[in-house]
Structure formats: structure tokens, C-alpha cells
Amino acid sequence: MRMNSRQKGGRPELGGYHAPAESGRIAAPDAGESNPAEGPYTMGRHFMRRKGAVYVPVGVHYVPRSGPDWPWRVDEAEFDAAFARMAASGLTSARIDLLWAAVEPERGGMDEDHLAVVDRIFDAARSHGVSLHPTLFVGGEVGDAYWDLPWASGVNPHADPGLIEAQARHAAALARRWRGREELIAWDLTDEPPFWIHCATTTDADARRWTDAVTTALRENDPGHLVTIGTASQEVDGGPFRADVVADRLDFACVHPYPIYSPELYPDRLLSRRMTHSAAFETALARGTGRPVMVHEFGASSAQFAPEAVADYDRLMCWSSFGAGAVGFYAWCWIDAEPGAYRRAPYVRMPHETQFGLVDADSRPRPRAAVLTGLAHAMQDLDLDGLAGDGPWCPASIPVPYEYSRPYDRASYGLDDAPAGPYVPSEAAWEPERDVKPLVRGWLNSYVLASRAGLPAQFPREGLDDAWPATPVALLPAPLTSTTSSLLHMRTSFWQGALDYAERGGVIYLSCSAETAIPELASFAGVEIVDRAPVEGDVRLMLTGAVGGMDPGQTLTVAGTEAAARAGAATDLHLRGVQLRAADAQVLAVTSRGAPALTLARRGKGAVIVCAYPIELLAAEVPDGLGDDDPVWAIYRLVRDTAGVRPAVDLDSSLLTRGILTGEAGGILVATNHSAGDLTLPLRADAEVNGLRVRIVDSAAEERPGAAAPQAAATAGDDVHLPRGGAAIVTWKRAAAHGGGRRS
């Protein structure tokens, strides 16, 4: 199931950035009743657990090859055969759709014959050792399909009080029926809400009320099973079901990264660096709400991309998101549509939807099937509890504005402490359809650049206390530094804490656009904005100091300025830089006109780095941008070097993305090769680290039947060969308490 990104549509009370200072981890809100104390599956401190042991589901969504409207076409036998093949492939879980119109064809009247079929589908899953993940109320599914209700046609089920009550009763009945099922891994409230046909009429408040009603009904009648929602594009589209709105009612959140449907964010080829970071990016963004996150759907059509390219894409997506903290994986989907289904909706209208299978319509495996098999074997082979049970190590924070989490919240206006006038923000009239995409472009490209620099980042939410991150690095790319649209920037009072953060040892990075406005900039950054920068088609920064491995005298070309000029940088101030004047900041690069372009100001134990150009938003304008030869990542490496941050174990290359997971016994380095070629790199490790072992995951390793890719013992300094599109999984143990990284 995929939602076209062109369709638009309370949060957990985390306060500010209250993570432990040592790790910078985002603390989860109190799960309360949402985490079942009894039951076959529970949530641990990071991973899901099955009967006490870490369990990472690696599975697939099953749609019968005859089409998504399966209740009218097939019975349990089709599911049984598919589950048998999944189990033989090493997959451990299957997600299925329960179509509302089939389960409840009349208001309040359940179809007992159909439910008996679903009973037998549960039995089939159990018999093959496959956990089952049922999705309720499926309405939107595959292409443009919306399976309507015959007794409530055209009514928005997320907003209509009567339909919300009906769904609560429906969920309660199913919970009572299947609460004893140990093969049921978790309830999925529905697939990709808001239902596509009702995107424009569903609000944040609707999403919250609907989620409250259905989760309450499930938990009152089945307190022993986990609950989630299979959301797609909600974080990157600013949709009403984004994790900030609903995640505190769930046991884990979900993302369905489909960058192929978001050219406004990913104007790229399938194996481009941005594309293959989409799952890790969305995982990290949703994790900022304090809930674990599953990569709950992903894939690409073999009708549009070569099957071997799709396999490389899946491998990079899965392993990089695992390094970013993902706790489960469900591919879309198990099998292609059969040719006889091509004449029927939705396939007759959406031909690409026929070819997403791990296997073709005749059950012949495609290369991506081996990727999932290898992932499943590795998840069972790794000591995830001891080496990764604490989740990802993230030394950098990219903040999420409060307005994104809770738009137009009266508490954010600062008028409740004393008598004040009846303030109403005119911004709601100026911009009734708020565009979140400039913010997401800034986040996304900042995340990719930080990944290239070996600086794993998290996305903590801004609070009303103006607290700064607990991490040693704060990355604030444009438009977070801007003004005018409150959706896109930090609160004005947030900047009052910048100097204190830096003086206590934090390193701040800012990129500026012609929209930037920070009252305290001169005091904490040692520079001031003089004017808007000239609009130029080609901006080259001449280095006057060392920057991320580049020497003084070298030139750093800012990609995207020519594209931005064509796109109208003269009128879109987010794509235009600023002219800076340095006070006490060191100038590390200048423009062709001699103006400061990159500066560094020392403040107490920390520092502030300012870039005069919105390099992240400019990179977003370049198709297939942030490629192997793009040098802008060096600015982020300057940030890392200035902070003195480094992981405990590393394969140090800007062509790799490295995620670090830690546990009580050691850690795991997940290095994914997003470059255009094979790499051979020396393994670096801190002195406290021992027991190094290396596993290479690529197409050759995945072809070995019946087992995980082999591990080999290693020592610091050993060369590690990592093929293009592959992943290196390096595990280590430690003799004493030692986190995922350190500051020198």
C-alpha cells in the first residue's frame, strides 16, 4: 500500500530535550497501559520481545495475487500456501488486510462466515511459525483503490462520531475473538490513514479522537496485545496521523518510506544516496516522539526498476534504518499480481502496482527475496539484547519545531501568565494550507550530510521550556533559522539558550538563508547578517582554514545554486544566502566577493559554526544530489571534528553511512555503502573495545542458503572490503562501561 505524496491531509508530552546527557537518547513517554504486562509480545527498552527474548520481525505484507479485494476471491488455502513459502524463506511475520466491508457488510452485523475464514488464516500462520499482523478497517489500498462501506458510503470514518463509535465496537468484537491468539504480534489499527479519499477532511484532532477510541476498545477487550498504526508519509507530509499526534497511544510507531512517490523531496534515481536514506531518515524522525519505530512497508516496482537494483535498494534501506533504530521490517509485498488481475481495478489503472513482489506471480523469487531472508537470519543470529538493547547512539540533534508537533497551540503564545489581549494568529489565514516540505527538505539533506560525516543524528522535539539538546552537537539547518512561517523555524526564545549551550561544551551548526532572523546571533555566533547575498548561478567558497579534511586554498562548490537561481531564488528567500560580517568569529571560507561564507566562533568549552548559504535546501534542488563527489559534507565533518565526537568503532569514509547501536555488553556498527563503487577501509576501534567480528552483507552472502552471512574475527587496523550496495555489520564487546562513542 502506498500513498501518493501529493495527497495532503496531543502529542506525547516530552517537554524539552530530557535525554540523558551521556548518550543523548530520547526518553520515551510513560507507556502506561499501552504496553501489555502479559502477552506473547511486549516492548522492551528498545526492541520488541517475544516471551522475554528480543524479537525483530522480518516479514512481508501479503496480498493474494488475484487482487487486494481478497475476501470475494480466495479463502484460507491461498494464505496457507503463502505462509508456508514465507517460512521456508526464513521470514517470521506476515501482515494482512481485513477489509471493513467484508468483515461488517451491514452496520453492526459481522459476517461470521468470513470471520471463520480469518480464524483459519490465523491457524495457518501458527502452523508455519509465522506471526500474524492484522490490519483493521482497510479502506485505501493499492494504487488509487478505496474500498468503501455499502452502509456509510462517502462518510469520513476518522471524523464522523457515529462511524468512530461503530469502529470502536468493531475493534472490540475482533479483540474479544482473537485475544487468545499467540500468533497475533500486534493490532494495526488501519493501513495508511487518513483514508486516501478523506485526506483533505481529516484534522489532527480527528486523528487523535479516532486513535483514542479504537485503541481504548482494543485494550479494554484485549490487554495482552500490542497496538500500532501503519502510517505512510505522515511525518514528511505533515499529515494528521504523524507520530507527534498519535504515537503516545501506541506501543510502537510505523513508517512506510516510499521516496519514489515524493519527487519534491527525492528527485533522484533509485540507488541515489538520498533515496536509500529515506527509511533511516523517517525512522529517526518518528523516533523523536519517544516511541520505537518499525519500517512497516517499503519497496519499488520491478516494472519500473531492475530487480537487482530493487534488491540493493532494499538492502541499503533496511540496514541503514536498523542502524538508525528501526525495530522491525515488513516489505511490500510477497507476490506479484497475476495477469488475470490486470483487467481489474486497481491494477488496470495502476500498472506499476502489479510488480512489487518478493516473488513473481508464479512464485519464482526475485533478488529482493534473498535480501529479506538474509536480514531475517541476521536478526536471529546477532546478540541484539547485549549489543543493541539500548538503541542507537546519536551525538547530534536536529530539532523539530514545536509548531510542527502542535500547530497553533495556545500554550505556545506566551500569553497565559498575565492578562493579555485576545490574540489570534493571522498566519492561519495567510497560509491556510501550510507547506511542510521546506522544513522536511532541510531535515532530510542535513540528515544525509551528517550521515556522510559520521555524525548520527536524532530529531528531538522542541518544548516550551526553550531547552537545548542533551547531545554534544546541535544541527540547525535552514529553514530552522528562518522567520515568517512558524511551522518552519524554532521559537524566537529558543535562541536565548544558544550561548549557554555552547559555553557548556556544545557545538552549534547553523546554515542561513535570506529568511534567517536570530536576534542573539552576534553574541553567540560572532557574526551578523548585513544583507541578502547576491543571486548567483555558481557559488564557490574559497577555504581560508582547514574544513573537514580540505585544506586552505581549496574551493568548495555549493551545489544547487544554479538550480535555485532557475527556480527563482530571487523571490524564494529560502534558497538565497546571506551576506555576513564577522566580529570575533574566525573566517574559514569566503565567497568570490570576499564576504565571510563559513565561520567558527569559540564560546567557552564549545563553538558555533555558521554557513552563509542554505546548503541543505540548495542540495534539495539538485536531482541525484549529494553524490560521491559533492564536497559539502566536509562542513559537517568540521562540526564533528570541532565537537571531538567519534564512534567507538568506525569504518571512516564519507561514502558510507554508519549507525551505532549499543547494549550492556558492547555494540554494533552498521555501515552501508551508498556509493557507486566497492570500498576497502581500515577498521578503527577504541582501546576499550575487544571481540571485534565483521559480517559482510551483499548479494553474494545472501545467496548462501539457510544461514546468516558468516562473521569473521577482526582486529583494529584490519582492512574491510565492502561492495557497492552492501552492509558491514561489526560487533564488539567491551571490558568496562563505554558508550557508542566519545568526545576527545
Which sequence ranges carry the predicted segments?
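Mature N-terminal, pre-catalytic/accessory segment of carbohydrate-active enzymes
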Residues: 3-96, 102, 651-663, 672-677, ...
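Active-site mouth of glycoside hydrolases
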Residues: 38-245
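Aromatic-rich peripheral "rim/lid" segments of glycoside hydrolase catalytic domains that contact
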Residues: 167, 334-395, 408-410
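Active-site clefts of carbohydrate-active enzymes
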Residues: 194-200, 264-266, 279-314, 352-361, ...
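Glycoside hydrolase catalytic-domain groove-lining segments
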Residues: 226-230, 235-303, 336
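Substrate-binding cleft of secreted/luminal carbohydrate-active enzymes
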Residues: 298, 304, 311-348
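Aromatic-Pro/Gly-enriched surface loop or interdomain linker
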Residues: 369-470
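A conserved amphipathic helix/loop scaffold
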Residues: 482-743
